[in-house]
Amino acid sequence: MSSQKDGVPYPFQLSSKAVPSSTNGTTVDLNLPLKNVRGRIPAIQASQLRSMMLEAYNDPSKIVAHVCSYDGLSSRLVEEAGFPVVFLAGYAVASSYGLPDTGYIAMQEMCNKIQETVRMTSVPVMADGDTGYGSPMNVKRTVECFAAAGAAGVMIEDQTWPKRKFYLSWSKIEGNLSSAVAGCGHTKGKSVVSRGEAYARVQAAVDARNQGQDIFILARTDALIHGWDEAITRAREFERIGVDAVFVEALPDRQAMRRCVEELQLPTFANIIEGGKTENLSASDLAQLGFAAVAYPWTLVAAKLKSIRDTLDGLKLSMTRGAPPVILGYSEVCKGVGFHKYWVGIFLIGADILLI
């Protein structure tokens, strides 16, 4: 799918972004050798994602930005904007159900979202596997099912299940009930499993990849809550087990970010949550620090909340003042949701259609 013509171009050019194809450009030549394959059964999108990540890892002027989407339309818009990958994050997907990211979403619901997104996009799709939904055998099944659904990558973390504890406190000064809630791994009260259980999860994920369909494996640790040594010890063991990339969650500042990259010998992820615990740096700054990728878990969720609320306020105001405001033209909305492709398809198969 082509990127948005009139939008801002993606600032980091990745030579490995192109998908290998046959000379006529209509089908993929399965005889073409895929680069950077790690699974028993090669997968084009996993190969492409891994190649992009390694390219960015080896070039401090590049970084792979993972904008976290939540459904087919938002994912397609991410691709149309020129981003090289789509990330179905647990926080964003849970929000599409009107729920917080606290373990409500099950594996099959994520698989459904993966299939929905893969049908709507052509770039690699990373998917959030959370804790793997149970024992190491559940982790293995999660990775296998995500790969079968079309995911190019999966993230597995070492938080406990249920994922988070929430602490409610009564504020006498404010006179209301408030909860200590933030987002994703920046949530207060989170806890992690033991090293042994964390390693078993990651080993199960790697085994699923090595014994089956190839898939990029990102291992995440939230163990920074127990100190630097604990987090890096886990990250290094994840690396030894054989993951493709590591994500140490909630690194506070540039110094910690640089140290993390220097102490690991594989692609690393950064996580930018506006207003979160991590210093809010530009993608270019993160690339210079040595990160291969950066994720934006709730940028689109925040945009959705604000835009819908603002639009509803505008609609209410218009009810006593005149016609409702035109946000987008009719044809632009139809094109945005895919009607133009439907009309082209109908035309090509020779069916009668009334073009509006």
Map each language-model feature to its residues:
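Alpha/beta enzyme core
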Residues: G25-Y296, A302-A303, R309, D313, ...
